[in-house]
Amino acid sequence: MCCVAPAFARSVDFAIDKPAGHPCPNLGTTPTASPTGTPAGSGTPTGGGFGCGIHTQLRQRGFVGCTVYDCFGAGQKVAQVTFGGRDWRQAPGQAPLMFAAFATMRHLHELLWYLTQARDLPAAAPLHDRLDAAVAETQRLSDLPAGELAGVDVDAHRGSVVPLLRQASELARAKVVGRRTPYQSRSVVGKDLRRVDLRGADLRGASAVGADLRGADLTGADVTGADLRGADLRGADLRGVLFLIQSQLDAARGDAVTRLPAGFSHPAHWTVQRTHPGTDPTRAGHPRSGREAGGRAGRRSGRR
């Protein structure tokens, strides 16, 4: 579903143009030997499979965007639950409805992800009843029949959920020990933030493309929707970061010393060597570590 429904344009993230609703030419192919950097469409068709023929070579073939895309489990639910195991190949007449339902489901599952993370924050205890209600309503919408699901007003529902997530964030960030006036910015593209105190920072929706965050302590920092493409997280401490998703890490750079919350993994393209041999990179720019700041402010919960 994820390789068919969305559209993408040729760019630094994708090697080709692909219209919405059209399968990627690498879908259902097997890899063929080719030089690094060869564009898409060089696989061998396998007769209708759902695997990516260049999955292990996506970055080398110019499909970085595929490696950082996260549907939050929406594709599986639409195929297995909403449409009872049928797919767009088995029921081509329903493909447009499937793709419309998928687009809605992805938004709802993304909201479920953030709501679940907010519900797990101890500091957000005063909001638990409202968060539980928001989870239940979002889940109810995601369980609607295909026709109703595709017609859900996602923007209206998001508008009711986002203020609640912001309140949860504010409560959690206020608990960061030693927090001064928190850093806040919506654009830190390419900036050197190694000496900036980012504990409890508000980086919601920030563009941090190529930002230098080496050794940064992001305890209690809210990174909801932050664009971390190419951001340098080597040696950074993200154990207490708020509202992180794996695809943000996949889009960034890091190393073996980058500290992550439980349940997250170091992307395969990250370096494995220490960035600063003999030092504790999490202390760069300030005198305190994540443990001294009160430990992890939240944890990653299971995907919905």
Give, region by region, the residue ranges found by the protein language model.
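Catalytic cores of enzyme domains
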Residues: V154
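Short, well-ordered alpha-helical segments
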Residues: R130
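Hydrophobic scaffolds flanking metal-cofactor catalytic centers in soluble metalloenzymes
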Residues: M1-P122, P126, A134-L149, H157-S160, ...
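Tandem repeat scaffolds
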Residues: R166, A174-E292, R296-R304
